[in-house]
Amino acid sequence: VVALLAVVAAGCGSTKKSASSSPPATSCEPGHLNLIKKGQLTIGTDNPAYNPWFAGGTPKGSTWKFNDPTTQKGYESAVAYAVAKQLGFASSAVKWVVVPFEQLFRPGAKSYDFDVNQVSVTPARKKSVTFSSSYYDTNQALVAIKGTPITKAKSIADLKSYKLGAQVGTTSYDYIIKNIKPDHQPSVYNNSNDVNSGLKTGGIDGIVVDLPTAFIITGAEEVPNSVVVGRFPVVGVGDHFGAVLAKGNNLVTCVNQAIATLKANGTLKQLQNKWISSAANAPLLK
């Protein structure tokens, strides 16, 4: 009997270890997911939400200042709903909540299952949150006003004497500090509207942003008479956008499976072609 109990105990211990390291196939069904609210997928993003990541305007009564994510338009909104579908959720079971960018990395409980907000995956951020695999890869670019001296820049060295700006807490700001290393301390702004205003009013000579956003700023004339001066070389592993989850949330396994499927079946590529401008012709600033 003792021997039999030992065998049973050993079997139970083995099963528990296996479940921890390798979730069963059914674990990604809605009923098995680690969610804020059962039966509902809660997704966070900032307010306002910006093109090309969110689009479609703001329906009457919406919480969002513009580009309500529930329209399913814009790259990140479309990706979020595609992930939700892979996880077994109908669109009606998806709820969006407002999460300011600067609050994403604070410790403690989260109000969302995952957040999409053009968040670049970095080692420092991984200390406080869990990231999904990448759903978009990009590099940094420079935007300036047409005809200004900075637009003649052909290299990173040509930018040393100019005043640059970026949004707080972004890899764009880090790129300025670590790679461009201008003579002047770069200006830091709370959101993209403030960054754009800095360029419009002449407070800065140029904006550093991810390349798709650079083409939206210029193409949609968010900053009138602006131009993409060029794109910067990828340094290290490059810039990857990942969904943000609470630190250690095992939901990431299922989100990663969904993203892998969307990559394999061509959905991510189709959504990029639909919502994000081509950046092939941007000159490289070495």
Per-region residue spans from a language model:
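Bilobed "Venus flytrap"/periplasmic-binding protein-like clamshell domains
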Residues: 43, 48-50, 70-87, 119-121, ...
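Extracytoplasmic small-molecule ligand-binding "clamshell" domains
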Residues: 23-116
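Acidic, polar ligand-binding/catalytic clefts
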Residues: 92-158
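A ligand-binding cleft/hinge motif common to bilobed small-molecule-binding domains
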Residues: 103, 119-128, 177-178, 200, ...
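Periplasmic-binding protein-like
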Residues: 136-144, 219-257, 278-286
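C-terminal motif of bacterial Sec signal peptides marking the signal peptidase cleavage site
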Residues: 7-11
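Extended ligand-binding regions for polar small-molecule ligands
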Residues: 79-82, 86, 148, 163, ...
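Bacterial lipoprotein signal-peptidase II cleavage site
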Residues: 12-21
